Amino acid sequence: MVEILGKSRTAVLPLAVVGLVLSLFPIVYLHVASVGELSPISHTISDYIFVDNGSGLLAVTALSLAAASVGLLVALVRSGLPRRGPVAVLIGLWAAGLTVATVFPTDPSGAPTSFSGAVHRYAGAVMFASLPLAGWLISRTFIASTTVRRFSVAAGVTSLAFMVSHVAVVYPGSGAVVLGLFERILFALLYCLLFAVASAVLRREVSS
């Protein structure tokens, strides 16, 4: 009976990892397909909605990533994480931010900020702040993982750099526009963080 319960507790974890992996395919395709059309240095990932099939593919990535993150949260809770604690709230905000940013797309470069563009921007700020902090709290209060902690700190620093890089967009001529580069580094670190958390949960379940 104990063995059956253990399997049921961890059944959601492989699904979350599969969701993380599958969410990568559309965004990688968009990067390859838009070479010469969008700059990975100056254009954000959200700008892929303006290329052929970009809106749908980007939505698949964002919503798959949100669903996988919720699945990972379920795995964390089944491993003993408090259901109503700050980590659950922060991961929920991350997933919600991804969803809201998908429903409210960004504005074209140089266009005035619309209601949708403003909501998209604030949703991005919430999600990019939430996940690094959630990872740091997991490593400090739930699963002692140096890897999770390092990716959390690196993602937090890069998230701050991404926010600061918007200055060159808001005030043209104040510096090089590199927010696309920082955002891509940030997403790479956030993916690594999510995979690191999944690995830490698996190790915890195996050892229990």
Locations of regions flagged by a protein language model:
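Short, highly charged, low-complexity non-transmembrane loops/tails of multi-pass membrane proteins
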Residues: 206-208
